[in-house]
Amino acid sequence: MAGKWHLGHHAPFLPPRHGFDESFGIPYSNDMWPHHPEAKPGTYPPLPLIEDGRITDAEVTPAEQEQLTTRLTERAVRFIERHKERPFFFYLAHPQPHVPLFVSEKFKGKSGRGLYADVMMELDWSVGQVLGALERHGLTRDTLVIFTSDNGPWLSYGDHAGSARPHREGKGTAWEGGTRVACLMRWPGRLPAGATSDQYVMTIDLLPTLAGLIGAPAPTRKIDGRDVWPILAGQPGATTPHEGYGNWYAQNELQAVVSGNGEWKLVLPHRYRTLGGRPGGTGGIPAKYETVTLEKPALYRLSTDRAETTDVAAQHPEVVARLQAFAEKCRAELGDSLTKRQGSGVREPGRIEGAPTKKKAKSG
């Protein structure tokens, strides 16, 4: 893999310990480093560059950030060239366009529409380089390419962020603007070109789907994803294997549940951040969010109202009851800090063996 890992920066949590033979990139995101415009002195340690579990550059500088998209792309292309004779899996997780933004000289100012657009042009170039490498080595028809994202835009950054329109809100919320992202797949001969699907799937479904395609045994531990290949392949009559999906955020808050087919979404009472219609910031400095409270559950029919403008809970009490029951199943297994539920299936967080633990202060 190459790019942003963001699943822990100590050795037990790095890619070599989690199935990757090769890895190169940064352990967390761009805003978690001393060079962020709003970072206070001492808030973050230096951002290192790590290769195969070893630090090769203790402090990535802004100048090096400008070259990172190019370097990650080159890694992906070289990996394809070296492994063209055997099956492979490569995960390319570009840090951009996460703020703060950086772009190489070859794309700086090229879009004519600002830094964010320049960054997107460079990422478009990167995708083209990877697809070109597959084409050169005759691998196009043998390779499933998946292009997707982890969340919606960070709206407070304004001209250094994207747009979630027509969806509501953005990153850091359970509204569609925060959770619904693009997913494009290419596999000539297996996936029809130009086809679209309105079926609802989640990133958690990728692992079991890919495992099923290559005939790999299912993981022995319990996972929440399901094999959704029949849906992706457009097989007639294919339906979701999920009863529904849960959207947790913050300190394990179950903020919304969605029916398995994506028809209905019940947003549960919680506090969330919003710009309240105000514009985002400029030049990499974010605008301030305000916090509002959703006092009662709100139901939206996503098939006709993806913008979540009209609460139809009063018109469909039976749907509300069904999704509330599903939410209770979610809480029973994975907990919910909003309702102070622990959850029978909650695992302990990863810890470093021998690391000191925080002691609670004595009262009195």
What annotation goes with each model-predicted range?
Residues 18, 70-74, 121-128, 201-208, ...:
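A structural signal for well-ordered alpha-helical segments within the folded catalytic domains
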Residues 7-85, 94-103, 271-273, 289, ...:
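Formylglycine-dependent
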Residues 21-32, 40, 153-165, 169-176, ...:
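C-terminal cap/loop subdomain of S1 sulfatases and analogous C-terminal strand-loop tails that border
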Residues 76, 206, 271-272, 280-298, ...:
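Long, internal low-complexity/basic segments
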Residues 19-21, 84-90, 139-145, 180, ...:
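Loop/turn elements at helix/coil->beta-strand transitions in domains of secreted/extracellular proteins
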Residues 10-19, 99-103, 109-119, 132-190, ...:
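Histidine-centered active-site microenvironments of extracellular/periplasmic hydrolases
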Residues 1-13, 27-29, 91-100, 147-155, ...:
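Short, solvent-exposed turn/loop segments enriched in Gly/Ser/Thr/Pro and often Arg
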Residues 76, 87-93, 120, 127, ...:
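Beta-strand elements within well-structured catalytic alpha/beta cores of enzymes
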